[in-house]
Swiss-Prot record:
Domain of life: Bacteria
GO cellular component terms, semicolon-separated: plasma membrane
Sequence intervals crossing the membrane: 9-29, 103-123, 135-155, 169-189, 229-249, 278-298
Cytoplasmic side: 1-8, 124-134, 190-228, 299-306
InterPro entries: BPD_transp_1_N (IPR045621), MetI-like (IPR000515), MetI-like_sf (IPR035906)
Function, as annotated: Part of the ABC transporter complex GsiABCD involved in glutathione import. Probably responsible for the translocation of the substrate across the membrane.
Gene3D superfamilies in the cross-refs: MetI-like (1.10.3720.10)
Membrane topology per record: Multi-pass membrane protein
Protein localization: Cell inner membrane
Protein name: Glutathione transport system permease protein GsiC
Any one of the GO BP annotations: transmembrane transport
Length: 306
C-alpha cells in the first residue's frame, strides 16, 4: 500500500505540469487586457503601457511562462495584479471559509443522502422509496443559484431568521451549506439506493436473515459495509466537486471564499490568481481520489494495491 501511495504521489508531478501549461495558455487566451482593466477605462495608451510593463505583460509569452513555472516550483505564484499582494496570501485568506463551507455541506449531505438512500432501498417500490427519490430528483434538477435566492428570500428577507452575507458565525453557514449540499445529498441518495438494492439481493444477506438476525442488524452490519465501496467513490468525487464547484453559491451569498475570489479574478483578468487557484483545485481532486483509493482497502480488506 505504501509503495502504491508513493507512486501516486510521484504521478502528481507530470499531471500538475500539464495542468499548469493548459491553465497558462487558457488565461492568456481570455479576451480583455488586464492592464486596461487595472489602469481604468479613462487611462491613455501611455499609462496602459506603463502598467503592462509593471505587470510583466510586455514580455514574450514563452518568457512569461518560464517565469511562472520556475517560480511555481518554488511555491511562489507571484503577486496579484489587482491587490499587489502575494497570491499565496490571497488564497490562504480565502481557503478556510471555503473549506469549512465544503465540510459543513458534505456532512449534512452524506448523512441525509445515505439515510434517504437506505430507506428507499429497504422499502423499495413503496411510498418511502417514491418520496425519497422524488425529493432527490428535485434536488438534482433545481439550480443552485435559484435555490440560494429562494432560501435568502424566505429565511432572510421574509422571516429574518438567518443572515445572508459574511462568514462570522455558525448562522452564516446554514443557507450556503444547504444550497451547496442539496445536489450532493440528492446524488448520494440515488447512488446509495442503487448500491443497497444490489447488496440486499445477495446470498449472504439471505443467509443472515435465515439465521434469525434482525432486519436492522442485517442492513447495518452486512448491507452497509458492502454497499459503501461505490458510495465512497461518489463521496470523494462529490467532495472535490464541492471544493471546486462552490463558485455559484459563493457569488450568490457573497461568501469570502475561493470561489468568489476566482470569479473576481476572471473578471479582472488577474492571471496569477487564476492560475494558482485552478492548480490548487486540480491538486485537491488528485489527493481526494488517492484518499478514496486508500479507503477502499480499509472498507474491504480483500482489495489490495500494488
Amino acid at each position: 500500500m505504501l509503495n502504491y501511495v508513493i507512486k501516486r504521489l510521484l504521478g502528481l508531478i507530470p499531471t500538475l505540469f500539464i495542468v499548469s501549461v493548459l491553465v497558462f495558455l487558457f488565461v492568456h487566451m481570455l479576451p480583455g487586457d488586464p492592464a486596461r482593466l487595472i489602469a481604468g477605462l479613462e487611462a491613455d495608451a501611455q499609462v496602459i503601457e506603463l502598467v503592462r510593463q509593471q505587470l510583466g505583460l510586455d514580455q514574450p509569452l514563452y518568457h512569461q511562462f518560464w517565469h511562472y513555472i520556475s517560480n511555481a516550483v518554488q511555491g511562489d505564484f507571484g503577486l496579484s495584479m489587482v491587490s499587489r499582494r502575494p497570491v499565496a496570501d490571497e488564497i490562504a485568506s480565502r481557503f478556510m471559509p471555503t473549506l469549512w463551507l465544503t465540510i459543513t455541506s458534505m456532512v449534512w449531505a452524506v448523512i441525509f443522502g445515505m439515510a434517504a438512500g437506505i430507506i428507499a432501498a429497504v422499502w423499495r417500490n413503496r411510498w418511502p422509496d417514491r418520496l425519497s427519490m422524488t425529493i432527490a430528483v428535485s434536488g438534482i434538477s433545481f439550480p443552485a443559484f435559484a435555490l440560494g435566492m429562494l432560501l435568502i428570500q424566505v429565511f432572510s428577507v421574509e422571516l429574518g431568521w438567518l443572515p445572508t452575507v459574511g462568514a462570522d458565525s455558525w448562522q452564516h453557514y446554514i443557507l450556503p451549506s444547504l444550497t451547496l449540499g442539496a445536489a450532493v445529498a440528492a446524488v448520494m441518495a440515488r447512488f446509495t439506493r442503487a448500491s443497497f438494492v444490489d447488496v440486499l439481493s445477495e446470498d449472504y444477506m439471505r443467509t443472515a436473515r435465515a439465521k434469525g438476525v434482525s432486519e436492522t442488524w442485517v442492513v447495518l452490519k452486512h448491507g452497509l459495509r458492502n454497499a459503501m465501496i461505490p458510495v465512497v467513490t461518489m463521496m470523494g468525487l462529490q467532495f472535490g466537486f464541492l471544493l471546486g464547484g462552490s463558485i455559484v453559491v459563493e457569488k450568490v451569498f457573497n461568501w469570502p471564499g475561493l470561489g468568489r475570489l476566482l470569479v473576481d479574478s476572471v473578471e479582472m483578468r488577474d492571471y496569477p490568481v487564476i492560475q494558482a487557484e485552478i492548480l490548487l483545485f486540480s491538486l485537491e481532486f488528485i489527493l481526494i481520489n488517492l484518499v478514496v483509493d486508500v479507503l477502499y482497502a480499509a472498507i474491504n480488506p480483500a482489495i489490495r494495491y500494488k
